[in-house]
Each structure stands twice: as structure tokens, then as C-alpha cells.
Amino acid sequence: MRGLAIFVAGTVFGLAVTALAQSQSPNHGIVGVNHVGINVPDLDKAVEYYTKTMGFPEAFRLTNASGQVQLVYVQVSKDTFVELQPATAQRPPGITHFGVHVDNMATATAMFKQRGAAVGDTTVSGTKAILSNIVDPNGIRMELAELPPASLHRQAMERWR
């Protein structure tokens, strides 16, 4: 019984310390890097490579009104994805951005604006994620993503094995 009491007390203490540390974090509300976006010359080949060769299951895909695939997400881990989009003349092949999962978009954008970042408008994507973008001085785009329960990302995370 004494061992159980010590275990419970230690667990409660650990949770309290973790909560305190997170509340004092300079990046409070940032969950972590969520995805990397890549424009690819052949979407079917890229999906085949990432699913068959790399073993990353397809999480979801988004099509436009005419049925053309706009993007495919493959899932690396429960909360990490690779976003694949067809390359075009306007979107050449290569890595286009990285995505950062945030708990609350309003809080995250306010924090980054206060720090001097030029934060783009907040939108809701076709995947039902709430998005905003920041471009760093080197031209690298960071996509902030809040993932509500209705978002395809959150649904894929919940289905993860």
C-alpha cells in the first residue's frame, strides 16, 4: 500500500511540474512540428514511394470539385505527416513549407505578432484545419495549423494505430 501511495504522489507531482513548466514555456501553445509540405512532379509515384517503400500509410487526400487530387497526406507517426502536392509551373517541385501544430490559432498568432513576425491572415482550409502563415527572412514558410476535431489531420491522428 505504501508503494502505491508513493507512486500516486510521484505521478501527481510529476504532472504538476510538467504543467508548470509548460505554462512558463516561451512557446506556450505550440504542440510541435506537424508536417512538411512537398510539391512533386508525379503525385502517384510520390504516394506510391511514401506508402510502399517508406511504409507511411495514406492518411487522407483532398480533391477539387472536378475530382482532381489537390493533396495527399501520408502519416509518419501519430502526429507527423508529409503533405504531397502536384508540382505546377507556379509551384515548382521541392519542399515548400513546414507545419507547426498549435493549440489555439488566436493565441499563437498574437504571440508571434508580439515578437515581430509578419503573420498572415487566418483561414480554414479544405481539410478543415485553421491555418496562418509566417515567412522567415530567408523566405521559408512556416504554416501554423490548429487542428479542430473536424479536421482531416485530427481524424487521422485519432485513427492512428
PLM region descriptions:
Residues 79, 103-105, 147:
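Solvent-exposed coil/turn segments that connect beta secondary-structure elements
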Residues 33-35, 95-97:
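Eukaryotic phosphotyrosine signaling hubs
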Residues 84-88:
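Amphipathic N-proximal alpha-helical interface segments
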Residues 2-7, 12-29, 62, 73, ...:
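Vicinal oxygen chelate
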